[in-house]
Amino acid sequence: MSSTPSSRHVLRLAAGAADAVALSLSPWTAGVRVGAQQQSGKQALLTGVHRPADAPEVLRTGQRRGHDASMLPYMPGHIVVKFSPAVSPQSMSAMAADIGGRASASLHHADFVYVDIPADADPVAAAAAMARMPGVIYAEPDGRVFPTFHPNDPLYQYQWNFQKIGMERTWDINRGGKSAIIVAVIDTGVAFQDKGNFAQAPELKGVQFVSPYDFVWDDQEPVDLDGHGTHITGTIAQATNNSAGVAGMAFNVSIMPIKALYTDWDQELNAPFPYGASTVARAVRYAADNGAKVINLSLGSSLPNTATRDALEYAIGKGAFIAIAAGNDGETGSPLLYPAVYAKDLDGAVAVAAVDFALNRASYSNANDYVEIAAPGGDTQADLNDDGYGDGVVQQTLDFDAVHSGVFNQFIYYFAEGTSMATAHVSGLAALLMDQGITSPKAVERSIEMFATDVGARGRDNETGYGVINPRATIRGLGLRR
């Protein structure tokens, strides 16, 4: 762990290229709190003495990092297996034992089981051996998942992203949606509550949170140990027109905070479920079963995952529209990113590319045939609007320097870039459409694509799909006025 706390942490969170949620944290230096936290994990933080949120108006710009090619693309110690309904639990156990593994008990919101294997065993070989057995529908390594983080509000002047897509005029038609519309943010968690050593982000005060869940810890406390999920939530629903900070697109909708990404802090605190893409699959099913109308997936994995694809189909069938980040590896050949790849074959799910201040594809944004739409993702290397800051997407989130030291109640306004940020814009627009009465996921996708502003090559292209979202044109074009 040779990187310095400030540079390594800030670089990673802003970029989110293909970081596999790796913060590379150095040993904790938080004094006497270290011992208690190491002994009791997350629960010690939740039951500690509450400290009020500290949110100075600090504006900070992040930088991008490249993909960490040294990290294995899958989680060790287990594989994901779906058996035929005819296979009994006893047979599952026997088949798992044949490869030196052990089948787990059934988990909620999962149509598969985990087969635990030795930590030094090869998950690819184990999955291949399992897949050859009769009664196995699929067996796969569990792909490592990473975030693709690459009004009168006083800092609204810095939100060029909302100004570029005409949000002020859109709010003239729809003032931020309604609480009946639930947007699930499946991510690193959200700073959604004041409890113990955790604090709610001040800009999320007034946001209604429903059905929270943490699949990494198997509890109802999806606190953010990273900052990515809080930043994403801000773009979607941050308090707006409140004479404070910045704005959110659909600021009256409800947020369902779901933690599915395993971070280094979770590892340090000995989280009981260190899984990958399969956890995202469970989270998607949970969101759909609990009434989410929009699901935001600002994340990705380099490996395909059948469980996640099945979960996307399930959620769309339950009436949820899904926005998925297209990926931040555009400068290294735009390799396939999952589950974004699946979007092109699913009506009701879209893969989202990122554009910069000039509405051109951001250099890091993946260009591929699965890209369907684009939205502001930013470019922190440029300052085309001459405001003195890199052209990232600014929202309030955890202070990364504080997080590095195990402090989760300090907040800053942070300029980030990535298809993560772009995806949150599409989720916000989808929520407004749902509020206006366009409730079919397929219709939401068609509406967003139909009224997008075409940029780049004429018609659909691999860089920006059907173009950059145009919220006002989408709502007005459908005759939806209030």
Located regions from the model:
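Extracellular S/T/G-rich loop segment that most often corresponds to the catalytic His/Ser-adjacent loop
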Residues: 187, 320, 341-435
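Structural recognition of the beta-strand scaffold that forms the well-ordered cores
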Residues: 79-82, 104-106, 113-114, 138-140, ...
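C-terminal subdomain of the subtilisin-like protease fold in secreted/lumenal serine endopeptidases
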Residues: 283-285, 290-297, 306, 318-320, ...
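Active-site core segment of subtilase-fold serine proteases
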Residues: 136, 152-290, 294, 384-411, ...
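Sec-dependent N-terminal signal peptides
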Residues: 9-21
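Primarily auto-inhibitory N-terminal propeptides
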Residues: 25-156, 171-173
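Catalytic-core regions built around general acid/base machinery
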Residues: 304-321, 338, 342, 348
